[in-house]
């Protein structure tokens, strides 16, 4: 699963809508901010799975055509993996560019996405890797991975669903393994519009992410909030230092 790089949860209800322009033209053409009341926010969060399946081919084409401005955090994640590591990509979308880059470095990838169309693209592009149609909020495998990432996917979940993901992260990450996810720079919700369809985003406060990581056995390695060098993404990179409960 992917998301429009230009829209972050810093754009909350009550903020004046953007005119759709952006200093990064490849981002601006993907999505424009669009604003709703609280009830619509809840509906928007519940429609994410259907949204990505409906627009899977268009979104995949747009993502592949856009410049990969958020590559540095992915590269940093990769440098922390042991040789031959197995990586779980939650919300993998069509596999380009993130899963394809990780696979090209010689790592084993298990990609999970709720969109059958997106997973079909992954299977065509990288048939030697493992691809699963599932919702990250409920998927379980009984396996632990050396690396787990939820990039441009986690922040499509509502606040409570985001909180519930941390025990899942812990259960999926091997001791000493690395976790990477991105969200927004502050607590909030926003709904953008992709091809005329509402597209929901949410974020908790950075301090709450830090607490959730700590409480679920992770040690924070790095975080960045909206830095241009990281494609203006806000991300958290952490290592599992305590084995999750069996």
Regions found by a protein language model. Give the residues of each.
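Conserved class I S-adenosyl-L-methionine
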Residues: 35, 41-82, 187
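Class I SAM-dependent methyltransferase SAM/SAH-binding core
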Residues: 88-138
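Conserved beta-strand signature within the Rossmann-like core of class I S-adenosyl-L-methionine
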Residues: 176-183
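Short "lid" loop at the C-terminus of a central beta-strand within the Rossmann-like core
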Residues: 184-189, 227-228
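Core SAM-dependent methyltransferase catalytic element
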Residues: 225-246
């Amino acid at each position: 699963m992917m998301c429009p790089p230009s829209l972050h949860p810093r754009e909350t209800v009550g903020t004046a809508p953007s005119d759709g322009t952006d200093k990064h033209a490849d981002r601006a053409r993907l999505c424009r901010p669009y604003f709703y009341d609280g009830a619509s926010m809840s509906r928007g969060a519940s429609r994410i799975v259907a949204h990505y399946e409906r627009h899977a081919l268009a979104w995949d084409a747009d993502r592949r055509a856009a410049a990969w401005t958020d590559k540095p955090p992915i590269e940093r994640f990769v440098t922390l993996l042991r040789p031959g590591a197995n990586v779980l990509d939650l919300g993998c979308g069509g596999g380009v560019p993130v899963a394809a880059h990780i696979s090209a470095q010689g790592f084993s990838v298990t990609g999970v996405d709720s969109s059958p169309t997106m997973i079909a693209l992954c299977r065509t592009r990288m048939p030697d890797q493992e691809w699963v149609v599932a919702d990250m909020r409920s998927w379980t495998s009984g396996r632990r991975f050396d690396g787990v990432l939820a990039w441009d996917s986690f922040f499509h979940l509502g606040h409570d669903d985001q909180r519930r993901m941390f025990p899942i992260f812990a259960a999926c990450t091997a001791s000493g393994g690395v976790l990477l996810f991105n969200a927004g720079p502050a607590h909030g919700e926003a709904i953008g519009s992709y091809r005329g369809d509402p597209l929901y985003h949410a974020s908790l406060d950075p301090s709450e992410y830090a607490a959730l990581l700590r409480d679920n056995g992770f040690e924070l390695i790095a975080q960045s909030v909206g830095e241009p060098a990281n494609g203006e993404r806000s991300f958290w990179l952490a290592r599992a230092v305590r084995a999750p409960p069996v």
